[in-house]
Regions:
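Functional-site microenvironments in short loops/helix caps that host divalent-cation chemistry
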Residues: 36-177, 184, 189
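Short, structured beta-strand segments at or near domain termini in extracellular proteins/domains
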Residues: 189-199
Length: 199
């Protein structure tokens, strides 16, 4: 299996849109931080992880390139490796050389560039796994609900939302599930994705 070294960036997603001419059937909240009139992202966002995409949006992107989203256990493997380390980089506590600075407030600040913290790389060189954005993985469906497993963790928590998540939630033993309701509701500013490819 080949794993993308970084989450998909705004520049990569823009290139995909130009090549594929793809637009989702339901575009509520789709690329909400981009300019809807000309399809551009804000200045300086080229290397930031693309967000405001649903699980379906991410799946379509991966499939277009002959790839797919990782299963949760695959994500765990390339993040944690065979030694059970608590963090991608090993056993040292998180700091701002390895993950972005945590913020808590009313405004959702942009994520860091995907290559901003090389000291946070995993045992196999995969970067930006925790502390920047959640990452889409598996979907589990039963007779009445669908849930996606979110791996990694974001750099921001809304003010007064201690229920949102403990932070820093960077330990690889933890994950969140996301109740999927509709594409428009599933898109948010704290979840990105990376692709894997079977070989």
């Amino acid at each position: 299996m080949l794993v993308d070294k970084y989450p998909v960036t705004n520049a990569e997603y823009q290139d995909f849109l130009r090549k594929s001419n793809w637009i989702p059937d339901l575009d509520v909240n789709w690329l909400r931080d981009w300019n809807a009139e000309n399809g551009s992202f804000p200045d300086g966002f080229e290397s930031k992880p693309v967000v405001w995409l649903s699980h379906q949006d991410a799946t379509f992107y991966c499939n277009y390139y002959g790839k797919r989203l990782p299963h949760s256990w695959e994500w765990q493997w390339f993040a944690q490796g065979p030694d059970g380390r608590p963090y991608p980089w090993g056993y040292e506590d998180p700091d701002e050389t390895r993950i972005p600075k945590f913020t808590n407030g009313r405004q959702h600040p942009p994520a860091d560039n995907v290559d901003a913290h090389p000291l946070g790389a995993s045992w196999c060189g995969i970067e930006d796994l925790v502390g920047n954005v959640y990452q889409w993985t598996d979907v589990f469906t039963d007779e009445h609900t669908s849930r996606a497993v979110l791996r990694g963790s974001p750099h921001w928590r809304p003010s007064g939302s201690h229920w949102y998540q403990p932070f820093p939630n960077t330990a690889l033993s933890e994950h969140n599930t996301y109740l999927l309701m509709s594409e428009g509701m599933d898109r948010n500013g704290g979840t990105g994705f990376r692709c894997v490819q079977d070989v």
